[in-house]
Amino acid sequence: MKQKCVLIITDGIGYNKNSKFNAFEAAKKPSYEKLFKEVPNSLLKTSGLAVGLPEGQMGNSEVGHMCIGSGRIIYQNLVRINKAIENKELEKNENLQKLLAKCKRVHIIGLYSDGGVHSMDTHFKAMLEICAKNGNEVFAHAITDGRDVSPKSGLNFIKDLKEFCENLGVHFATLCGRFYAMDRDKRWDRVKEYYECLLGKAYKVPNLLEYLQKSYDENVTDEFIKAAQNENYKGMREEDGIIFINFRNDRMKQLVEVLNSKDFKEFEREKIFENLLTMSVYDDKFKLPVLFEKEKIENTLAQVISKAGLSQLHTAETEKYAHVTFFFNGGKEELLENETRVLIPSPKVKTYDEKPQMSAFEVCDAVKKGIEKGEDFIVVNFANGDMVGHTGDFNAAIKAVEAVDTCLGEIVECAKKHDYAFIITSDHGNCEAMQDEKGNLLTNHTTFDVFVFVQAKGVSKIKDNMGLSNIAASVLKILDLEIPKEMNEALF
């Protein structure tokens, strides 16, 4: 069976039997049609317990890539935190107790929705309650979502938070859309707006809920809400404690850097803060206390390949680069021996419906070069289905699928020419459901299964009831390497 192997992850493309508002179905996709006819294929589960999330919870890119790259189901921070709240372990957390003892005033910052991709509203409320009951003066700083949940669902979430704060005697201090507060592409002007808001230098309003409604009236939805503060809020003091509620790291790193790093040079800052506590490890370089330490994940797919002395290439455009490196490698940033990484810059547009092909063709070229060079294993992510799916623009999402389809055709042809096996799958769905029955835009991920195609010597059928955690062992089987005991079985 021994062959070199390409693993292609088509981010945000899932299977939905309903063809209405389904960008995948509506797209012209000759490469996919050929794959369905000629290559063994099946469906994989990408949500809920199959990827270590609560039952019914949609999958996401971080979880999906960790599952694919580690070859096992890792119970995600979302599940770990839920359990810690239920069994009262969170309030006993040593790092939390230290912060609450040291700082009279405490600020809680995070994405406030039930999307479950970056955070959970229940975690935010649990933390407010713990801090308030401890006797600290508490300030809530809500970031509105509109991306992992529907674009105007913020009104109900923020109404809920406002009432919760009033009942607890907590200050509801600021409001801002994730477009600004949670940028991850070094657009520092956006983060600066939020930083100034936290310092009490933003647009002042008497009622943040009314401000949100007013934004809707001006056609500004949750993701893009401009930073505003309650008129009574006077800003953070340097001695205050700051707790970050998001358990996913990639969209909080820049904000933490702005608030805490002594070496930050992107813009002038009036204050730097020392008393920070993050829900999970955002970046090892921060040296900050955390509530939930990283679980050690050993014997990942990339590690096994590296230890065997084989070469590997990991490539994607900026938006998904962390997923094929950090997350795919089990939450480890460092480069392995014989591992090459190629980062293709994502286009500098406000939202990706403006350029639905994104940088797919450049990513495709990097893969073909890797095949021609003879890399033993290549993993690539095409971001289009997900990133364009998030915009809610149906026609742009169709173009996104078509761009991916073109790239698949080229890579498959190149793989066959050089006798490479290939596996094509997705980390989760998105663009296959762009509106609900009522015509509301759906910008979030789905809980649908995803396709998997396996072209390799000796493979004619894929087992039933498989998931993303079965892919790593499949790659090792193709490469003729031993499958470690930590991994789930192969797809075939």
Swiss-Prot record:
It is an enzyme of class 5 (isomerase). Its EC number is 5.4.2.12. Disulfide bonds: none annotated. Pfam families: iPGM_N, Metalloenzyme. GO terms for cellular component: cytosol. It comes from the Bacteria. Its cofactor is Mn(2+). Keywords: Glycolysis, Isomerase, Manganese, Metal-binding. Pathway: Carbohydrate degradation; glycolysis; pyruvate from D-glyceraldehyde 3-phosphate: step 3/5. It catalyses: (2R)-2-phosphoglycerate = (2R)-3-phosphoglycerate. Monomer. Belongs to the BPG-independent phosphoglycerate mutase family. This is 2,3-bisphosphoglycerate-independent phosphoglycerate mutase.
